[in-house]
Amino acid sequence: MSTVAKEIQDSFETILSSLVEKERSVIVRRIGLKWEKETLQEIGDTYGITRERVRQIEDVGIKKIGRIMRTSPLMRIQESGEKILQLHGGVMTRDRLVSAIIADIGIEWNLNHTIIDVLLQADYNLQRSKPRLWTNTYFHFAEVTKKMVEAVHKEALKILKKKGDIIETSS
């Protein structure tokens, strides 16, 4: 692992250690930090709680990470993410944004990319779309509303259909 990737991983693990056990466990298991990623259901079954309760615990932990990391070297990841998002009109798919941050900061690809995803979710200036079928998860600034994104998507589909440059998929 490169020095930058190791530094990020170590800083992230230090921040995780300041969370309560259940928050830390849920986040580690969700992102696959130690083993494979686990679903909300798998984690919920372990604790005897619902998927929704696991999601709530994860959200609380991520918000705490956001507060804690303001004084850590990990802030540069959020700063890079905000800068890149600004250059791309305030909205970008999660995968493209994470890849752009990796390139911008010069992180080796052997870092668990979901660490960057969690750090972006912890950024109070960014919002993450809810996972939906047939769409990519994306990050955006608060002023870029879901309604605006859907309107642009709808208009782009119309233009592409008119040009015959779209492949229809059956639902």
What is each model feature region?
Residues M1-S171:
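C-terminal non-catalytic scaffold/interaction domains in large multidomain proteins
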